[in-house]
């Protein structure tokens, strides 16, 4: 009887070990990482484009309401003034390329939750919630590719406008994660 239990246990272990191995993430070696990042060592200069509704009134991006320098409603009212009427991604990329930069990174969504494209996960985006009424990210990405530059996309996981994100401002929270872990999990799935 004991032998049967041991054999059965070993058989189960052998059968499931292949499943676990298939789901394991292969760790990148230092050599693989160096090869993947080689371009970055040679790039020397990159331009980070930090652009969003905060450009309307020239406030210090979404930290201005988070740090309570101005009320959230006043900060978000910039959506109605964010027309992007002078937005010219070709001119931006001409300038970035002329500067000698080899890559650029753009903020696709900052902590305020406003996305520069029509995301299906939120109506808080430049197409549905701003005066621009259009996708501002795709034209930028297309120009980066035309100019032969590397591209980075900055996407903030923090989203102070999302009702399920616990922290609202520096001093205000919507809820305590310990008291409502289901709500936190709901945000994480967002």
Predicted stretch roles:
Residues 1-24:
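Bacterial Sec-dependent N-terminal signal peptides
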Residues 22-190:
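Mature catalytic domains of secreted/periplasmic carbohydrate-active enzymes
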């Amino acid at each position: 009887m004991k032998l049967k239990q041991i054999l059965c246990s070993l058989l189960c272990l052998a059968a499931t070990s292949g499943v676990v191995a298939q789901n394991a993430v292969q760790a990148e070696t230092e050599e693989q990482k160096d090869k993947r990042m080689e371009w970055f060592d040679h790039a020397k200069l990159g331009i980070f484009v930090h652009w969003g509704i905060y450009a309307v009134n020239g406030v210090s991006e979404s930290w201005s309401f988070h740090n309570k320098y101005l009320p959230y409603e006043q900060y978000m009212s910039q959506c109605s003034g964010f027309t992007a009427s002078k937005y010219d991604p070709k001119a931006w990329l001409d300038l970035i390329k002329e500067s000698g930069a080899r890559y650029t990174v753009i903020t696709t969504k900052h902590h305020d939750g406003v996305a520069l494209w029509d995301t299906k996960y939120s109506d808080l985006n430049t197409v549905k919630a701003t005066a621009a009424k259009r996708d501002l990210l795709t034209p930028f990405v297309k120009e980066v590719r035309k100019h032969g530059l590397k591209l980075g996309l900055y996407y903030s996981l923090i989203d102070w406008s999302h009702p399920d994100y616990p922290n609202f401002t520096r001093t205000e929270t919507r809820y305590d994660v310990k008291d409502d872990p289901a709500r936190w999990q709901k945000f994480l799935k967002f």
